[in-house]
């Protein structure tokens, strides 16, 4: 069958840069889904996106659907004909609806009877007939939160639509979408190529747009931007800070990237680097630059959408724009330092953390007390921990943080050092928000860990305590992130802390503000649920996680040891048999409603296999006890794995549910003791 390249492009006014890639890939997914659902084969499909368009190119697309045979079953033969063999009205009506005579029908014989049958060949539709509706469907399914109208039209889309291009090879596919008819013309560069560009063949799309100063491939354009930035940075013997989110946004802002470098006054470097960096990135979409040692320098790299004959004019304009931004940061820094962090404590009384839970001042005091409590458990400086907790939210009242919320905590560190606070306290102020996201760094020192954990536990306990736990996708206080962050800090920093203890201490600090009587249980259950996500991201199997969750160990380090032990156990050759045996024992005991003995009675053992199992188990138990005391779960499971052979022999030769009640209970007691030894570590019966 003949194949051709399909091109579909929607040309628009400037699309929101933060949404461009999402829109383009969603359109790609939708078109691909439409092609697949219509049984149209192709070799490859590619997506494109610039500020004023998104498109797909489909290669080696068949020109039409395959023909297919459709079987249409009619009435049963005994209904289709009377005794004389004449066709009934039912048979005639069915035949007429299928465009045949009754005697042209085939017969379908099954085990349930015989029916009339018509096999019809349905011709496949041409691609050019299908594409317009497919495009409309793909556009309607795009994730657009706030569509807009333009002109006198009632059509709605994310931005006004200028062109629609639908080409199959060199043929224009007739149709329209969003009020625009299809053509073979697309928009060139807004400044370098003001007219429309004619695409004579779908294969020419990328090359023709390149002539019109449009690099239409998003990924290729991004690669060019990265290469240009690195080259410019290398030319000034510096290193550019290339943030992925900013890079995506800049790529979505330009069609023909040209990268330049600007300079700002060195005096601005007296301001901490972080607010300067955020000002350059967030406000101006510039890439900050450091020296080879990572120190910010008075340069910035920016990407323009114009290949200018006089780039110095563009550079001067951008230098002029960045100057007042950096001057604002400098002013905030100088002004903020006139007031100590401690003096800002009172102003926290005017800011609510949450209506039922009180102000940020009250939260700071709770964080301080819980931080002190944690520091005492870790044998750290409790006084420093309390001080850091108390000052933890004060920088939120500074002008710098009000202007650049991203530097909260970081500015607290700088202001604390300026106030004469010690290094531990200052660093803890910055560390309190860590980890901010998956893969983020953790607090540097244990004082910072104490404050970070306290802040997170306080939020968890408070919000659960007023019955406002996260529901569905709604998590306004970022409690899921708080739970995972607490887990990460405790495990990765190897802190000997118990979540139940911390939760109960936090509840105590809230006084009578909490109304949920089950706060402690609810918070612990919520955090336990985050363990699943935490370990799944590390590639731990779900059944291993489930096995440990059955024990609900509230100390994360203990949880971690059990996970490692069960993972190790699951790889042993004895694991499958012992898991099955534990499950079998659990099922047997679940059906037994009597009372077991305190211990196995050898006098009631009538079979050699049960005596052998009891003896071996006793010897192994003596080895396991000190291992459990040391929480050496892996070694304990290694010892218990030796029970496989005697357990196999026991089940092969011993009737557990003996007619003799005493013997039966004795055997169940032995099996229960063995099961409990495993369950002291994890529920291995769930392993698969």
UniProtKB/Swiss-Prot annotation:
Lineage: Bacteria, Pseudomonadati, Pseudomonadota, Gammaproteobacteria, Alteromonadales
Entry GO CC: cytosol
Similarity comment: family membership: Belongs to the class-II aminoacyl-tRNA synthetase family.
Cellular compartment(s): Cytoplasm
GO biological process, one term: arginyl-tRNA aminoacylation
Keyword Nucleotide-binding: yes
Top-rank taxon: Bacteria
Name by which UniProt lists this protein: Glycine--tRNA ligase beta subunit
Pfam families listed in its UniProt record: DALR_1 (PF05746), tRNA_synt_2f (PF02092)
Catalysed reaction equations from the record: tRNA(Gly) + glycine + ATP = glycyl-tRNA(Gly) + AMP + diphosphate
